[in-house]
């Protein structure tokens, strides 16, 4: 507010479909409000509409880098001939999602759930959960087509080989999934602030880029129903892939910086030029 009173431009960047309280309050005085989700615009004060830019969410996209699927699969311990389901529960992993997947694989190995033929799982457990997940898999006889890792340093490389993802619905995660055109099953974190992950997941499901499942109602059986539907329908996956890419803006950082530079005295050029 002090910056607005002093005539200093105020720029905000909102990453979620439901704008946070700070964004909703300060947007009244903002010169620019950059949003990642077009759905968030309707939740901002009417007076701020002219200053709103649907710019996307700044993420790290490697420039001029080619990803060879065969080589990357080999590097990750995956079979290049099988499609890849990527499961990631956030930077620290998710105990709830890990337990869900463990129980699903246990039922799969016993024959009570589909084996999802032609697919393999790359499971990012989180560092603190990796040992317990591996121990559980060992007790199941170390099922094939399941590869666990504690953490991924180079997520763009992994996203480039993922054919389907199971994930939380945080702003950065969903932005990366959209940028790489990865169809996804989104399971929002129930305790996220203002339930923003729920809003993100619902927005992406409405656009056709994802399937939204609630953790409280989820069982291994219901997760497998969605997995079977997707893994057996390449046409559906392709439509979701196109919908995801349509939602993405991998140049978001450049777009936002370009708009900010326009506010500087004596500058009116596009840094993208």
Region spans (language model):
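C-terminal alpha-helical cap of glycosyltransferases
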Residues: 249-273
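Short alpha-helical segment that forms part of, or immediately flanks, the ligand-binding pocket
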Residues: 1, 156, 174-182, 202
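A short, well-ordered alpha-helix in the C-terminal region of glycosyltransferases
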Residues: 236-250
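Conserved donor-binding/catalytic loop of nucleotide-activated donor transferases
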Residues: 6, 160-162, 178-187, 207
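Acidic donor-binding loop of glycosyltransferase active sites
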Residues: 149-152, 160-175, 182-183, 228
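Active-site-proximal region of nucleotide-activated glycan assembly enzymes
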Residues: 4-70
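Donor-nucleotide binding loops and adjacent catalytic segments primarily
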Residues: 70-74, 78-165, 198-201, 213-222
């Amino acid at each position: 507010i002090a910056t607005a009173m002093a005539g200093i431009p105020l720029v905000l960047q909102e990453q979620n479909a439901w704008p946070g309280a700070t964004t909703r309050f300060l947007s009244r005085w903002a010169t620019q409000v950059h949003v990642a989700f077009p759905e968030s615009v309707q939740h901002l004060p009417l007076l701020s509409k002219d200053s709103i830019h649907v710019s996307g969410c700044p993420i790290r996209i490697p420039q001029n880098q080619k990803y060879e699927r065969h080589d990357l699969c080999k590097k990750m311990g995956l079979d290049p001939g099988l499609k890849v389901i990527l499961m990631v529960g956030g930077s620290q992993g998710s105990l709830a999602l890990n337990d869900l997947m463990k129980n699903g694989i246990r039922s799969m190995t016993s024959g009570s759930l589909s084996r999802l033929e032609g697919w393999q799982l790359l499971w990012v457990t989180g560092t603190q959960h990796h040992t317990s997940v591996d121990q559980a898999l060992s007790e199941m006889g170390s099922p094939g087509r399941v590869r666990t890792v504690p953490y991924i340093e180079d997520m763009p490389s992994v996203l480039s080989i993922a054919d389907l993802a199971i994930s939380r619905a945080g702003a950065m995660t969903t932005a990366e999934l959209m940028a790489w055109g990865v169809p996804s099953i989104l399971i929002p974190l129930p305790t996220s602030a203002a339930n923003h992950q729920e809003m993100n997941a619902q927005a992406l499901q409405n656009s056709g880029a994802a399937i939204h499942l609630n953790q409280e109602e989820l069982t291994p059986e219901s997760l497998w129903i969605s997995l079977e539907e997707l893994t057996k329908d390449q046409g559906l996956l392709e439509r979701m892939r196109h919908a995801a890419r349509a939602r993405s803006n991998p140049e978001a950082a450049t777009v936002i910086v370009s708009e900010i530079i326009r506010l500087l005295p004596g500058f009116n050029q596009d840094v993208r030029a």
